[in-house]
């Protein structure tokens, strides 16, 4: 999926705003690979969520003139990019497909679970024709528990809020549309889902590819670098899309290039 295709996919939800519905699901803590549960939300609040997140999608994709779309396996440090998740997908992220394919997921029982048991939200926007699902982590600062004292305005006075309540802001870390899972917040992904292990696994394939052509004498030196995700990402690029390896360039030409190229000399 390139940027033009992505804009076309996302624009559907903007152009068909009135025909798009919204459902919200929760991924619970300490539930392993269990399916997400649906959160029962009143219609007025759902309409507010739809407005917030359709606008947030628009800002993410359309309001950034320098935006690019890259594969996650070849990610770099550029700021204005969305990353297509082209690596092994963790089980928690696979629940996004569950939301799209299943209409009768169980509801969240608030008598058994408090709001602090929610790890992340899945916001599904769409209709029978097309869906987009947003993945949003839920920080504890957005959950207000009964242990605190919170007041709300009531006519001319303040009254105590007795129940837990949840603040849902705009913004999200990932979204899936038309079968493509895209990462918005790369830092969040790197800290979650065992992402570093996934990158190391893919990067090890890159080291193996270098070893196969006998370009280095000691691959253990390269394997030690994989504990640093910055270097692991670079070897992931080698495994997935190295033009040098794909072209079968002889080792002596590779070495000669490295010896003569200004920024590589002496490395």
Predicted regions and their residues:
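Charged, amphipathic alpha-helical stretches
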Residues: 2-53
């Amino acid at each position: 999926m390139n940027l033009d295709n992505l804009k076309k996919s996302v624009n559907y939800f903007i152009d068909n705003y009135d025909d798009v519905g919204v459902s919200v699901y929760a991924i619970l803590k300490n539930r392993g690979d269990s399916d997400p549960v649906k959160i029962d939300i009143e219609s007025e609040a759902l309409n507010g969520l739809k407005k917030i997140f359709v606008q947030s999608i628009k800002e993410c994709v359309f309001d950034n003139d320098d935006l690019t779309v890259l594969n996650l396996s070849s990610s770099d440090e550029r700021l204005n990019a969305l990353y297509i998740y082209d690596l092994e997908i963790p089980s928690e992220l696979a629940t996004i497909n569950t939301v799209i394919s299943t209409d009768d997921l169980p509801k969240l029982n608030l008598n058994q679970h408090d709001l602090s048991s929610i790890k992340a939200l899945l916001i599904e926007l769409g209709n029978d024709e097309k869906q987009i699902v947003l993945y949003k982590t839920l920080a504890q600062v957005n959950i207000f528990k009964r242990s605190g004292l919170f007041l709300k305005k009531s006519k001319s006075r303040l009254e105590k809020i007795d129940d837990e309540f949840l603040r849902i802001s705009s913004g999200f870390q990932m979204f899936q549309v038309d079968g493509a899972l895209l990462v918005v917040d790369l830092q969040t992904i790197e800290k979650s889902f065992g992402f570093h292990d996934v990158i190391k696994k893919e990067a090890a394939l890159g080291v193996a590819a270098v070893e196969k052509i006998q370009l280095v004498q000691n691959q253990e030196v390269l394997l030690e670098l994989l504990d640093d995700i910055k270097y692991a990402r670079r070897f992931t690029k080698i495994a997935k899309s190295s033009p040098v390896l794909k072209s079968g360039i002889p080792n002596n030409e590779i070495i000669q290039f490295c010896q003569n190229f200004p920024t590589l000399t002496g490395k």
